[in-house]
Amino acid sequence: MKASQFFISTLKEAPADAEVVSHKLMTRAGLIKKLGAGIYNYMPMGLRVIRKVEAIVREEMNRAGAVEVTMPVVQPAEMWEETGRFEKMGPELLRIKDRHGRDFVIQPTSEEVVTDIARQELKSYKQLPKNFYQIQTKFRDERRPRFGLMRGREFIMKDAYSFDKDRDTAQISYQTMRAAYKRIFDRFGLQYRAVRADSGAIGGDLSEEFQVIASTGEDAIVYCPSSDYAANIEKAEALAPAGPRPAAAQAMARVATPGNSTCESVAGQLGLPLSQTVKSLVLATDKLDDKGDVAGSQVWLLLLRGDHEMNEIKVAKVPGLDVGFRFATVAEIEEHFGCQPGYLGPIGLKKPVKLVVDREVAVMADWVCGANEADFHITGVNFGRDLPEPDVVADLRNVVAGDKSPDGAGELAIERGIEVGHVFYLGTKYSQAMNATFLAENGKPSLFEMGCYGIGVTRLPAAAIEQNHDERGIIWPDAIAPFTVVVCPIGMDRSEPVKEAAEKLHAELLALGVDVILDDRGERPGAMFADWELIGVPHRVVLSDRGLKEGQVEYQHRRDTEATKMAAADVLGHLKQRLGL
């Protein structure tokens, strides 16, 4: 490819609405062009990256035995009504009507359509397992699209769906896809982690996210450097506290804490570590009558250490709270505690509540909590002496760096990541909702056991940039760079030797199957180099009249700060070695 034939459009400044590095650089490098909120044109340079991502994904999915299909972007609402998602998905699901007034949706995922294919086509256990995948445009009507391709409304995604005869074979399909994903992300050349994720109502541990490591990532990734334990912040656990609760050493006392309504300020006033304070969170569950109207509520008090934060996913698994909970209203709090939020605690309640305690609090002695009176707290509080043992003890909190890993291998660390893939065991959630069955070996109808597996094809280049960039621009890994090598001849239009040498090297690289571009635009050296550093092509060869007279060219990898001079006769061999050819 010659640059004069290609479309190159770079900008010196990023648009004002670009907040993150990837959005700024993708726009400046001419990879994408905004059309509307969360909607982008994939320009030629950007499309080359996307096609390389797709090619790797397609190769590994085929290698894993998955079969490619393409399902419609516009889907009949009837199938989504079968699963209940037509209403449950809320405004993120874009709904449209055709000229006849029939309802349709623009697909964000395709569980319904692929399950419909299975129930029509997969009649017998002899046809299983099957795994269908597509690389297709999706749409989610994000309330606030931002960060360019990181959180757009229209995007390209690879979604795959496995169908098995039972849970055991479904787990084999899951592990097959997990292994395929590891090969895919290894080939991308990115730093990533496969982390355990919450499985929601389905339960179990068969749910993992593939996170590209980046300091700008939205997700917190918890891992143990001494083992293979890794989980997202919602799923991560610390090692349960060991040993019995210490004996009480203090008498309970009511102390004035004027104006100090937070654990931090109370700890500061009393000269105590924050970990000796206990925060009170008040939740409520609603009781419904036969008509579905609220007929009453149950108030719950959660106790966590002052230096810990509540994990809503974990709280939602507590029996009684698993039906759905909300934060209590001020009126409910005053009714049960006789106090405004800020000084709440479990002692001296006006009305009884369900007491749920984090397991770290359950083994504390002589702790500090609110006195249920403005400007007062209680010190020296102990379970069994000053208040009854809790109704429930559970893991309710987010882990923090330095916690013990649950496998006992060391301490947990936390880093930021960008989710670009997810493998998930679905069970019979969709097959049951859509009555998708096959004839089992016993001759009876049986529900498909399903799994789903997604990769954000257009999100991945943005994540790669967040991980691989510098002040000059993008630094692409070889596997997904728009071009692997750029040949930069200086004064090509004025020097026949430079032109001949550049075209010869270009032709030799093409013959080897290298994705190479020859910059024949006639740009000044500074502008030419700045363009390719911004675009991020990994390997650059510079040819000049003076260098060729000395029998030399310059080679520079995009990560290098300076170019390396080498014999012109050696540069092809050097590139072959660097590219593994």
From Swiss-Prot:
Cellular localisation: Cytoplasm
Keyword ATP-binding assigned: yes
Keyword check for Cytoplasm: yes
Assigned EC number: 6.1.1.15
SUPFAM superfamilies: Class II aaRS ABD-related, Class II aaRS and biotin synthetases, YbaK/ProRS associated domain
Any one Gene Ontology molecular-function term assigned to this protein's record: aminoacyl-tRNA deacylase activity
Pfam families xref list: HGTP_anticodon (PF03129), tRNA-synt_2b (PF00587), tRNA_edit (PF04073)
Top-rank EC class of the record's enzyme: ligase
GO cellular component terms attached to this protein's record: cytosol
InterPro entries in the record: aa-tRNA-synt_IIb, aa-tRNA-synth_II, aa-tRNA-synth_II/BPL/LPL, Anticodon-bd, Anticodon-bd_dom_sf, Pro-tRNA-ligase_IIa, Pro-tRNA-synth_IIa_bac-type, Pro-tRNA-Synthase_IIa_type1
GO terms, biological process: prolyl-tRNA aminoacylation
Superkingdom of source: Bacteria
Alphabetized UniProt keyword annotations: Aminoacyl-tRNA synthetase, ATP-binding, Cytoplasm, Ligase, Nucleotide-binding, Protein biosynthesis
Catalysed reaction, written as an equation: tRNA(Pro) + L-proline + ATP = L-prolyl-tRNA(Pro) + AMP + diphosphate
Free-text function comment from the UniProt entry: Catalyzes the attachment of proline to tRNA(Pro) in a two-step reaction: proline is first activated by ATP to form Pro-AMP and then transferred to the acceptor end of tRNA(Pro). As ProRS can inadvertently accommodate and process non-cognate amino acids such as alanine and cysteine, to avoid such errors it has two additional distinct editing activities against alanine. One activity is designated as 'pretransfer' editing and involves the tRNA(Pro)-independent hydrolysis of activated Ala-AMP.
UniProt similarity note: Belongs to the class-II aminoacyl-tRNA synthetase family. ProS type 1 subfamily.
Domain notes: Consists of three domains: the N-terminal catalytic domain, the editing domain and the C-terminal anticodon-binding domain.
Subunit structure: Homodimer.
Protein name, as recorded: Proline--tRNA ligase
Gene for this chain: proS
